[in-house]
């Protein structure tokens, strides 16, 4: 087979399939190949190529609707080479001649487990600009040592089968667990898959090509042929044509973050791939609508990416309804202003145009507008609504009576908080369009009274519990680390001395934890602990959050922070330059507080956040210790 060594595209296969999928543009195959070569050189994590791959107009590279219209090839040890640098993935999968997937397979119990494989990708392959073309064209990477997931005593699995997509520096390895609601030995998708028998002639040819005919009779080889090994299961789950095309079409997102460096805002782009629970939720929503169900609850635990799921759903459902000649219009409903801001930022980071409504009149105008897109950007849009703003509004919502080809989709966030659907503005809003799709998201189970109030939404569509999220490493276990003995003794000593004053009624108990001596000793511990933790982890971006017992204690911790740090630095061989930020509802104005949170979450210019009585919900800060 003729291939292009610059991109590893199978040229003849690509041209044949291009002509087949685009009969009126058949002569453009060569020019398209040339453009793809140029795009793959871009420093954009493959965005321009992915936009071409996933689009259906003016030409198609892949037929996403009819899997059988595409051709699928695989090869082993296909070298990716540029100048003197090269790497050789174990297996490469091609769709219409395009090398879109590679798979690295290791022996069970390989040295370092899959962590070693992750380091190799993150330290050697992703940062190497010579490999940019090959990584930009690759959409899915799978790594497996053919073992069941095992954390080996840690928190995140280090053995098993993992997947990721391209990155500039490092990509997180994701677990994949096939849907298996009744815990059968083999998940239904794998058990029912129409596998074909292995052709002995093809098998012999492959073994001969790799000069390893001798392994044919070995017990290990026979075990590896088992359809249900961890590697074979993940290949069926992610690389069977229907699933792979779904992931390629809907499972990739480019996310743009900002970061302030030396007073300048810099943008960082990442490429994300759908987590498996998001994929199954999206597939289930689609099949439920097929069955005539137009509402339900998705229970995905905190931290599992519900806003990202909502983003993916906008694409999945837009396509779904366009096949029925309907145009989908999306509303994301929250119950607090800070959540409106957070959701809007998340959607915008992924490229959606966000509309918000600051008054009922404005919302009603958007609601009555029968176009899915109100702007002229051509980008998909979503309207984010803070329902709290309309809490007292109980008047009926009227819509034009005539039928339209518009399909409204409501996604209600944090449904467990009980929006009281009966008789409220939300109820009136949802009732105004009986044909709307209504999806309620919750991160915690609905309690009895909440469940009652949400009966209008029907049953759970999909669930992803916190135990799985912890196993997958998305939700962290909170590890209670005892305070070091020497500090504990000093703090106890101070506490006991002050407690005698409490008994004499000279001070209140709350004042102990606010006392200068207590606060200063606590700061000595916090600063030393974070400094040492960073050294152990070899990561100076790690930050901490202090949740105080009283607001006065928070103020004092902040007030003495620099003084205590300077005192510790006097005798330290390695000095620390930590910066603290204080967040209290009555401290500074809202813009300043937002800036402090942004400096902690994104800009990394605040190292320790001091708060009282609030863990800032949805606090998505991966740098937190």
Locate each region found by the language model.
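ATP-dependent helicase/translocase motor core
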Residues: 1-329, 338, 342-353, 378, ...
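Conserved C-terminal RecA-like helicase domain
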Residues: 378, 509-611
